[in-house]
């Protein structure tokens, strides 16, 4: 703001306030001196001499318009250069009135929007590549550089090592698979190979040895498992054949270690001979047919009972004593016979061919049998309802 200082030379002095003392005279913000000039400049609530109000960058006097940032004052151009949008190529500020180019989020001056390789300024419609550092490369230069890079990264020619050099390196490897630097330098001097070539040869040699050991171990384990599988197959076949032989041999085994039943003694027998038992159960001389076993009666068999040896695995617990005559009881069916066996009925035999025990058992006073042997041809004719004949049976009282 431009102000006029009231002075003695001012014709309209009565219209202005006079300063009564030096303390009332404003101090210039630029030179810190009292302003006694006719015109005073006021910026940011501070007073300035007209000659002290200058741009902080270009030092040009500011008379018409100025821009401030903090305590500094700038002209328009310098203010936008410092605090305005900057060019992505030259990092300089761009005035708001200047025409610019944009590539994504980057802004360029017209003369800065150019290829960094051929320095050709890119016009509207040209194809280009935007690098990560905001630099621009035209399409032709980019493809050329890419092809050159691909050619440079091609496989290099292999280094040829003579037999003498190889022998020297092998001897050194046998002494130390991982030699020190001074040893590699000495080998490089002796063989005439590059230091890097010697180092790579030792690295490859160690890797090869490690791989060979690993392959050898894998082969040993594979052979071991194959042998185990083969041995298991052989043992399985042997086991099967052994089982078959065992089945045949088991079929031929006979229990010959035990003495025959006829040779067993009487020291630990269950029953004594029938001659020592009750007279009612002893057999008479002569061959008599066997009679059916009635309910509650014991009929001796054709062969005598033998005692069983105490040490035999087929031994039974000892009998407390000889058999006593069984008490008489009334049988459920006194004359039950099996006609197809050809044996006479116990109640119909004349008694001449029966032993006293059998005669005694056949003479029981029980109800007559409901079985008929007439019209049925040997099979009993039972009534239609089982209850009609089951109810007539008197249960024995033991």
Curated annotation (Swiss-Prot):
Listed SUPFAM superfamilies: Glucocorticoid receptor-like (DNA-binding domain), Homeodomain-like
Biased composition (Low complexity): 272-282
Cellular localization per UniProt: Nucleus
Function of the molecule: Transcription factor.
UniProt entry keywords in alphabetical sequence: Activator, DNA-binding, Homeobox, LIM domain, Metal-binding, Nucleus, Repeat, Transcription, Transcription regulation, Zinc
One function term, GO molecular function aspect: DNA-binding transcription factor activity, RNA polymerase II-specific
GO cellular component: nucleus
Protein name: LIM/homeobox protein Lhx3
Region ranges (Disordered): 208-294, 307-398
LIM zinc-binding domain boundaries: 28-78, 87-141
Gene Ontology biological-process annotations: neuron differentiation; regulation of transcription by RNA polymerase II; ventral spinal cord interneuron specification
Keyword flag Metal-binding: yes
KW DNA-binding (keyword) present: yes
């Amino acid at each position: 703001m431009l102000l006029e200082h009231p002075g003695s030379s001012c014709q309209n002095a009565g219209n202005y306030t006079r300063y009564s003392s030096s303390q009332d005279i404003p101090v210039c913000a630029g030179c810190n001196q009292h302003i006694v000039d006719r015109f005073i400049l006021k910026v940011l609530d501070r007073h300035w001499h007209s000659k002290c109000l200058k741009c902080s960058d270009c030092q040009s006097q500011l008379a018409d318009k100025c821009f401030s940032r903090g305590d500094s004052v700038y002209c328009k151009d310098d203010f936008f250069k410092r605090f305005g949008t900057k060019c992505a190529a030259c990092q300089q500020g761009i005035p708001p009135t200047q025409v610019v180019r944009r590539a994504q989020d980057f802004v360029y001056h017209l003369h800065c929007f150019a290829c960094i390789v051929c320095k050709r300024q890119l016009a509207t419609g040209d194809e280009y590549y935007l690098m990560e550092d905001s630099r621009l490369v035209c399409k032709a230069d980019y493809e050329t550089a890419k092809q050159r890079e691909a050619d440079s990264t091609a496989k290099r020619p292999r280094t040829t090592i003579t037999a003498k050099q190889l022998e020297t390196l092998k001897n050194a490897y046998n002494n130390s698979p991982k030699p020190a630097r001074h040893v590699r330098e000495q080998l490089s001097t002796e063989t005439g190979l590059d230091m890097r070539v010697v180092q790579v040869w030792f690295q490859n040699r160690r890797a090869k040895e490690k791989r060979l050991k690993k392959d050898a171990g894998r082969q040993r384990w594979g052979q071991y498992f194959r042998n185990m599988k083969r041995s298991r197959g052989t043992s399985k076949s042997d086991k099967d054949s052994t089982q078959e032989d065992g089945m045949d041999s088991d079929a031929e085994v006979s229990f010959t270690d035990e003495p025959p039943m006829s040779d067993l003694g009487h020291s630990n027998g269950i029953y004594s001979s029938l001659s020592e038992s009750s007279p009612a159960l002893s057999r008479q001389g002569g061959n008599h047919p066997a009679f059916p076993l009635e309910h509650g009666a014991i009929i001796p068999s054709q062969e005598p009972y033998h005692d069983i040896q105490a040490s035999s695995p087929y031994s039974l617990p000892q009998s407390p004593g000889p058999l006593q005559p069984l008490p008489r009881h009334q049988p459920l069916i006194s004359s039950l016979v099996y006609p197809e066996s050809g044996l006479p009925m116990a109640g119909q035999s004349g008694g001449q061919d029966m032993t006293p025990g059998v005669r005694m058992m056949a003479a029981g006073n029980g109800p007559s049998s409901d079985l008929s042997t007439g019209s049925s041809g040997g099979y009993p004719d039972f009534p239609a309802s089982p209850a009609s004949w089951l109810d007539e049976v008197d249960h024995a009282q033991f």
